[in-house]
Amino acid sequence: RYCDEEREKKIVLSARLRDLSRESGRKSVVLLKNEKQALPLSPSCRRIALIGALANSQKDMMGFWANEGVEKEVVTVYEGLKRRFPNVTVNYADGYDLETNDLRLSEARAAANRADVIVVAVGERFNQSGEAKSRADITVNANQQLLVKELKKTGKTVIVLLMGGRPMIFNDMEPHADAILLTWWLGTESGNAIADIIS
């Protein structure tokens, strides 16, 4: 009654708005740490281990607007890296369970051992931030932080993508990360925007 549905079909998810979404995503990312020139990724990089269930979750990239978005249209970090680096092998592993945060270290280590660099996605799910989602403890999940620590034992460069809708505490993993990007939830073009930033 109050919307022009035909106009909505033409505008929502149009190429122009997706380009704007990608651009605003790039401008929203905050570089918190970058040691030993971990970023941008070296042109010589040929194998990336992408670890962390958030890196392959379309719904979580929309944050607390997830119920209003079109999940199938979201570009995950996994998709974004493969598009941005077509000549690079991207080996993905969950690393942890999205629901329970139980660690899946064996598959994460296997992917990490085959890589030149490790990119780890940690943080909050779509339903953990937003209106009426206050928390007494804003520390990144202990198992997710432990995952970062364990992956650093490979001796490889570790880049952390910190996702969520609020500032978070991550003292336990910080010493084990060579670079940390606060990527928030960047919406439909999340994966493309993040891939642009790290390249």
Where are these regions (language model features)?
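C-terminal non-catalytic regions of proteins with extracellular/luminal or membrane-system context
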Residues: 3-5, 11-15, 19-199
